[in-house]
Amino acid sequence: NDYCKIKCSSGVHTVCQYGESTKPSKNCAGKVIKSVGPTEEEKKLIVEEHNRFRQKVAQGLETRGNPGPQPAASNMNNLVWNDEQAKIAQVWASQCQILVHDKCRNTEKYQVGQNIAYAGSSNHFPSVTKLIQLWENEVKDFNYNTGITNKNFGKVGHYTQMVWGNTKEVGCGSLKYVEKNMKIHYLICNYGPAGNYLGQPIYTKK
């Protein structure tokens, strides 16, 4: 697959720039890498947690918000795992550019959006479910009627991508590493088709 042919206005495709290898880059020096990529069990948990939360919101059961509750949705797809999106997410995660979005991650099939999470603990690696819940919790600042604006995007953008009604597939890359005695779990999820278009409703209200 020639990713150099996939064009984004924002820049060069991640796989074109860094190649197909998911081996941690020399940029990861100083981090003791314990594992690269989600396990099969974690992949299942990622999809399950996304769909559990998407269904909760779709059914109108999410009471948090500014104001809450969030309206029910009529177009909330169930997400499935996409290996290609996961591979591209992993190539980027393995560059160790922590909490930075890559410039181009599209596939031939989709424009692709991205969520990034990072958490650490002194005694265990935080679970993927914990990381995804960080995104979910942004709902507390979200007003459905205002939608996504330049002003609120930094506070709610992970939540809005997570429950973007039209998104169909998710694929994630991850690293677990030790740095300064902290056990850190770093997760990047890529979403196709992408969400978070300014001025569009995040899902259709029921």
From Swiss-Prot:
It holds the Pfam family CAP. SMART domains: SCP. GO terms for cellular component: extracellular region. Its main location: secreted. Keywords: Allergen, Disulfide bond, Secreted. CDD domains: CAP_euk. Belongs to the CRISP family. Venom allergen 5-like subfamily. This is Venom allergen 5.
